[in-house]
Design a protein with these regions (language model features):
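Short aromatic/hydrophobic "clamp" motif used to bind/position activated sugar donors
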Residues: 120
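N-terminal glycine-rich phosphate-binding loop and ensuing alpha1 helix
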Residues: 1-74, 80-82, 92-95, 111, ...
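Active-site-proximal specificity loops/subdomain of glycosyltransferases
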Residues: 81-105
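Conserved core of the sugar-phosphate nucleotidyltransferase
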Residues: 130-204, 208-213, 227-230
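Left-handed beta-helix
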Residues: 1-6, 204, 212-433
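A short, conserved beta-strand element in the Rossmann-like catalytic core
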Residues: 127-130, 393
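Active-site acidic Asp-centered loop
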Residues: 123-125
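Glycine-rich phosphate-binding loop signature in dinucleotide/nucleotide-binding domains
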Residues: 112-117
Length: 433
């Protein structure tokens, strides 16, 4: 698959619903899972799928993402014509930014023209999932398709957030609704087939449908191709994606390794475009048997190496023991006589004595050429149901996520957690409380 497919990763989104996390960075650059950025999942899928011609199209507040790509993803040998290249917005068609997903491709059409690839794989850089794009390419070729759209089954109650596909018995798309109020279900079920924003195009057909006014794949290009009778198909991610992984089992008293052909995270996909979705997907990772496995051997998720010392837990008095339960603790973290439960601590976080953190995501500190900035949680702090961005400093005795009125009075973003009486609190980057 290496050279017959060109990957174009759309990574310029503003991520307005993720504010304030995206006030200083684009959505694909938001830290996730302790040591990762959101875009690392899409790029890892590309590498694991054998793709070696990859463009990353950036636009909105791209400095953080650009730095991450240079530091962590500039490893393919260009002398062998392999690359992951960042392409900033060029304004090729006038003095304007991208007007939509398809317009981003149109403004970079020269890159596609210069490529020998006959298929173009268009990806979003802001979803959390594992996917073998080779299986989708094989499906596309087997159907002699002009376009294949990867789709996932979602409850009908949630389908209005997505583009919804209607397909025939051969998975050919016969109808498309972009974020409909009354989504059409899969016949006989209470589920809908939702577009994942992942497309395989035949290059020639893609060029035919990128004319003026064709700015967005969901709103313009896909409906136009379906209406024109083009061969447009849906790849059912829920049933057809396959990620193999090793697992250890006991057999006759001996621990042995075997390959599971379709691991459980083959069906995992999350759009983390809202704060509550980001928080929930983050906490998926801390389960004993997580929905998506960051520790797999056969489908690794790569990240940017960071030069922090190992994590450290100190103090052992009965009421002052440094401990983390059902949590992810990154390098450079010091838990100094504090208790952490069901949380993620990013690199460079220091939690001082007698503090308690639960159901929270702390992105940690930040390394620069000049200094190391840490996130510091003072003594006796209580943090529940929170997202705390980088380089935050909390004074001793600070409570977050306990009193909604108090959180709002301090100017923090507060949103309800669906199905509960609790609330999620977001502390922006660099804040001191």
């Amino acid at each position: 698959m290496s050279f017959d497919v060109l990957a174009m990763v759309l990574a310029g989104g503003m991520g307005e619903r993720l504010m304030p996390l995206t006030s200083v960075r684009s959505k694909p650059a938001v830290p996730f899972g302790g040591s990762y950025r959101i875009i690392d999942f899409t790029l890892s899928n590309c590498i694991n799928s054998g793709l070696r011609h990859i463009y990353v199209l950036t636009q909105y507040k791209s400095h953080s993402l650009s730095r991450h790509l240079r530091a962590g993803w500039d490893f393919l040998p260009k002398r062998l014509d392999q690359f992951i290249d960042e392409i900033p917005a060029q304004m090729q068609l006038g003095d304007r930014w991208y007007k939509g997903t398809a317009d981003a491709i149109r403004q970079n059409w020269t890159l596609i023209e210069q490529s020998p690839a006959r298929r173009v794989l268009i990806l979003s850089g802001d979803h959390i999932y594992k996917m073998d794009y080779r299986r989708m390419r094989s499906f596309h070729d087997g159907k002699d398709a002009a376009l294949t759209v990867s789709a996932i089954r979602v409850p009908r109650s949630e389908a209005s957030q997505f583009g919804v596909l209607q397909v025939d018995e051969d998975n050919r798309i016969i109808g498309f609704q972009e974020k409909p109020e009354d989504p059409a279900p899969i016949p006989g079920t209470d589920e809908c087939l939702a577009s994942m924003g992942i497309y395989v195009f035949n290059r020639e057909k893609l060029g035919q449908y990128l004319g003026d006014g064709m700015d967005d794949f969901g709103r313009n290009v896909i409906p136009a191709m379906v209406s024109a009778g083009e061969r447009v198909f849906a790849f059912d991610f829920t049933t057809q994606n396959q990620i193999s992984e090793n697992e250890w089992i006991q057999r006759d008293g001996v621990r042995i390794k075997r390959v599971v052909e379709r691991a459980t995270d083959s069906t995992y996909w999350r759009d983390v475009g809202t704060l509550d979705a980001y928080w929930a997907a983050s906490l998926d990772l801390v389960a004993a048997a997580p929905s998506i496995n960051l520790y797999g051997e056969l489908w690794p998720i790569y990240n940017c190496p960071q030069h922090f010392p190992p994590a450290k837990f100190v103090h052992e008095e009965a009421n002052r023991t440094g401990v983390a339960i059902n949590s992810i603790v990154s390098d450079g973290v010091i838990i100094s006589g504090a208790k952490i439960r069901r949380s993620i601590l990013g690199p460079g976080t220091h939690v001082h004595s007698y503090s308690y953190i639960e159901n929270s995501v702390l992105m940690g500190g930040e390394q620069s050429e000049e200094m190391l900035l840490e996130t510091s949680i003072g003594r006796g702090c209580l943090i529940r149901n929170a997202i705390i961005d980088r380089n935050v400093r909390l004074s001793p005795g600070t409570y977050i996520g306990v009193d909604r009125g108090n959180d709002e009075a301090r100017g923090l973003k507060v949103i309800p957690i669906q199905g509960t009486n609790e609330h999620l609190v977001v502390v922006p980057k660099g804040m001191e409380l």
